[in-house]
């Protein structure tokens, strides 16, 4: 899950939101989001975020900038995951989830 906030004149990902990665803690839970985004909870792609942003009156460039920022942060995410208290299997599952979902946002 994710959350946005606007500290000044730009939207940013919240520094902390839903800190429990349910997808690795409970692999039987197949939903990626608790609430729907553009009518979906799973297999979200760029088009779904763009639709939601347009519905909220946000420009496409804001969504694209947020995704670019997430991609830039990926090395830091990997470092944090691997320095965490998680087991090696959980670390791999967590990293795989992050990478897979970011890759999905790049698909057209």
Predicted regions mapped to residue ranges:
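Anionic ligand-binding catalytic core segments
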Residues: 1-108
């Amino acid at each position: 899950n994710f959350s946005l906030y606007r500290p000044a004149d730009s939207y940013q990902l919240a520094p902390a939101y839903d800190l429990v990665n349910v997808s690795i803690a409970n692999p039987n839970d197949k939903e990626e989001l608790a609430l729907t985004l553009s009518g979906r909870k799973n297999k979200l792609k760029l088009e779904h975020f763009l639709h939601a942003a347009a519905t909220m009156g946000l420009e496409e460039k804001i969504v694209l900038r947020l995704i670019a920022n997430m991609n830039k942060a990926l090395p830091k995410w990997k470092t944090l995951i691997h320095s965490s208290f998680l087991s090696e299997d959980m670390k791999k599952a967590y990293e795989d989830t992050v990478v897979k979902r970011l890759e999905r946002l790049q698909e057209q």
